[in-house]
């Protein structure tokens, strides 16, 4: 044996004698929380928000909308000045939803998800592009939007945001 090996053995024996009779401490003060699966919870929460928002849209209920002129709607507590500002394009949409090629069910779900997203991120103006096509979504989108409690007003979009094939939506953001 070399000199290093004997020193190592002596050190190890000395350490073993020093810690003889020592017991492992039991962790009793800090509780380790199990790691949560945050990604899965985020997915389920966003799906729940979308389905909750979709709850407001009924195909049986038909709100009274102005039939002549461009498509427009305003709640009773919204001034006509706000609708005029929507028409003129003063409000610039931060979110665009393109519903071209969607079924009614898909469009309804995406519309609910868009409104939930806007409320969550405090976005006041959005653009819904329903297209012209066979006029199915063009007729349904205003009816669905008029039923949602977070929609203050909507108006046919100016040409730069889609014209006849789009709506500008003004949303109310609840105070936190």
Swiss-Prot record:
Residues 97-172 form the Smr domain. Its EC number is 3.1.-.-. SMART domains: SMR. GO terms for biological process: rescue of stalled ribosome. Gene3D superfamilies: 3.30.1370.110. Acts as a ribosome collision sensor. Detects stalled/collided disomes (pairs of ribosomes where the leading ribosome is stalled and a second ribosome has collided with it) and endonucleolytically cleaves mRNA at the 5' boundary of the stalled ribosome. Stalled/collided disomes form a new interface (primarily via the 30S subunits) that binds SmrB. Cleaved mRNA becomes available for tmRNA ligation, leading to ribosomal subunit dissociation and rescue of stalled ribosomes. HAMAP family: SmrB. This is Ribosome rescue factor SmrB. It comes from Vibrio campbellii (strain ATCC BAA-1116). The lineage of its organism: Bacteria, Pseudomonadati, Pseudomonadota, Gammaproteobacteria, Vibrionales. The gene is smrB.
